[in-house]
Amino acid sequence: MNSFISMIRNGYSDTIPVWFMRQAGRYLKEYNEKKGRMTIKEICMDPELIAGISYDPVRILNVDAAIIFSDITIPLEALGYKIEFLPGGPRIINGYIKNHDMKDIIYFEESNFKYKIYDAIKIFKEKYHFPLIGFSGGLITVLSYIIAGGPDSNLNLTKRSMLSDDKFNDYINIIKDMIIKYIRLQVRAGVDAIQIFDSWLGYLSPQTYENYIKGHIEEILSEINVPVIYFSTGTSSIIEKLSRLNVDYISVDWRLDMKLARSMVNKKGLQGNLDPLIAAYNLRYALKETSDIINAAGRSSYIFNLGHGVIPETPVENLKHIVNFVHNFNQ
């Protein structure tokens, strides 16, 4: 059995599984050649291309799982939001600031979702017969994009809306519904697991997380019937609370010591957490930290990953060496 599948289902495998967030990205010349001048949205209209881009890291790096190529903002277009991808990240043209009353914004329906993610997943599974992770943005992270119109520094605009705007619950409900339906679509297409990317969750206080967001996250998770990995950053103060969610693995960033994380997540699995910059700029030290991380996390219920996505400057050879090191750890 593939080590990723064995680990995420059973908590054990003969070798430690490894994959990387943003493993299909700009650091790969194969990705850049396939992408050319195409936009993310144009790529997401071509299911064969999505499947091929998603599989490239498996072939090149020898990772143990692929993740479907897409973007967390892509399903927002089915709600009526207009998205542009700019160098600094996606921008929502008709978000909260310009469209506070949510004019022409509707609930997610698959018939309104034009991107070929479902077809790409089907093609990937039929063509490559390899573990595939689907994904969605986390609730507060996706909300922050539509409220701020793009990345929301420190969640300032999002928290202001959360605390003072009567319409915030309308935004919560429509995004929660979208996340549930978009995950169902991917599960139905055949993904083996789901990762939720809640990169901005750490900007909430523990009390705000409990009082405003946790219940909605629990609703989302109750609708998922494949293994779930929950990724967030800056959440060391609530990691124990996150471990009580109905998830299988907690993916942590590089700022949390893995031994401490293991003591805080009860019996949940762990994923992470090498600093992406270390992986990019100092292979020798990256391998030392990788060893320290694995020793701290332990071999059971553990998936090796970075603490965030691969950065574009990362040498492919560095990641190959890291994968090989993890696979041969204590063999």
From Swiss-Prot:
Pathway: Porphyrin-containing compound metabolism; protoporphyrin-IX biosynthesis; coproporphyrinogen-III from 5-aminolevulinate: step 4/4. It is an enzyme of class 4 (lyase). One of its GO terms (molecular function) is uroporphyrinogen decarboxylase activity. It catalyses: uroporphyrinogen III + 4 H(+) = coproporphyrinogen III + 4 CO2. Keywords: Cytoplasm, Decarboxylase, Lyase, Porphyrin biosynthesis. It is found in: Cytoplasm. Its main location: cytoplasm. Its EC number is 4.1.1.37. It holds the Pfam family URO-D. One of its GO terms (biological process) is protoporphyrinogen IX biosynthetic process. Substrate binds at residues 22-26, 71, 145, 199, 308. The record marks 71 as: Transition state stabilizer. GO terms for cellular component: cytosol. Gene3D superfamilies: 3.20.20.210. Homodimer. Belongs to the uroporphyrinogen decarboxylase family. HAMAP family: URO_D. Catalyzes the decarboxylation of four acetate groups of uroporphyrinogen-III to yield coproporphyrinogen-III. NCBIfam families: hemE. This is Uroporphyrinogen decarboxylase.
